[in-house]
Amino acid sequence: YCQKWMWTCDEERKCCEGLVCRLWCKRIINM
């Protein structure tokens, strides 16, 4: 399973998929 803090858009270590992943990555980048 994956926790929120594990989410990543890294293809090799991808924990999340699709829109949720993209939104989370944008949130991190904007911080």
Curated annotation (Swiss-Prot):
Protein localization: Secreted
Recorded superkingdom: Eukaryota
Gene Ontology molecular function: any one: potassium channel regulator activity
Coiled-coil ranges per UniProt: none
Disulfide bonds: 2-16, 9-21, 15-25
Keyword Secreted: yes
UniProt entry tagged with the keyword Hydrolase: no
Sorted UniProt keywords: Amidation, Disulfide bond, Ion channel impairing toxin, Knottin, Neurotoxin, Potassium channel impairing toxin, Secreted, Toxin, Voltage-gated potassium channel impairing toxin
GO cellular component: extracellular region
Tissue note: Expressed by the venom gland.
Signal peptide positions (record): none
Pfam families reported in the protein's UniProt record: Toxin_12 (PF07740)
Residues with the Methionine amide modification: 31
Function (record text): Potent and specific blocker of Kv4.2/KCND2 (IC(50)=34 nM) and Kv4.3/KCND3 (IC(50)=71 nM) potassium channels. Acts by altering the gating properties of these channels.
Anything else known: The primary structure of this mature peptide is identical to that of kappa-theraphotoxin-Gr2a (GsMTx-2) from Grammostola rosea (AC P60273).
Free-text note regarding domains: The presence of a 'disulfide through disulfide knot' structurally defines this protein as a knottin.
Family to which the UniProt record says this protein belongs: Belongs to the neurotoxin 30 (phrixotoxin) family.
Name of the protein this chain belongs to: Kappa-theraphotoxin-Ps1b
